[in-house]
Amino acid sequence: MMWKTQPRSKSSNNIAYYREGSGTSILFIHGVGLRLESWNAQLKYLKDHFDVIAIDLPGHGESDHQTSSNKNIDSYTRMIKSFTDEIIQKKFIITGHSLGALIAIDYAIKYKNDCNGIVALNCVFQRSDGEMKALKKRLNNIASVNHEKEIDATTKRWFGDNNSEYG
């Protein structure tokens, strides 16, 4: 699947993002190994009714890598807090998929006064040791992965072969 690459701006902490529309703000956070284009279908339909903001997590898409070797949910949450304080500057709905869902939940708990609502999609819970090992391997290989091929495989797994309407 080919997706439409969205134009990006960058925050002062080098998080790449796409923003369009007006009204209530919705922040979209993707999962491991993906990029903001994984939200293209949602952005396409919601931008006419909302202020949609999708980010590339640090180390993904066009965002810079985290400088800290301590890459965990808390460090991502703190970076996103800095981003929302600078870029959104008002209450918003936070939406995340997979890793993004974990970050969204952590953000909503820590900064509940920033959020009008939360959507957590495909959030993981109690991974086995084998699943954690596979996830860590995937995280360590992100820099060398062909992201388009990775997104194609993920999209095919979710939606089947005929998924052109989702990009």
Give the predicted meaning of each segment:
Residues 1-26, 47-51, 85-90, 156:
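Alpha/beta-hydrolase fold catalytic core
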Residues 12-18, 44, 53-95, 110:
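Active-site loop/oxyanion-hole signature of alpha/beta-hydrolase fold enzymes
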Residues 23, 31-35, 98:
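Active-site glycine-rich loops that stabilize anionic/oxyanionic intermediates
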Residues 31-41, 52:
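Serine-hydrolase catalytic-loop signature spanning alpha/beta hydrolases and amidase-signature enzymes
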Residues 33, 57-61, 125:
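Alpha/beta-hydrolase active-site loop signature
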Residues 89-129:
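Conserved hydrolase catalytic core segment
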Residues 126-134, 144-167:
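Conserved alpha/beta-hydrolase catalytic His-Asp/Glu region
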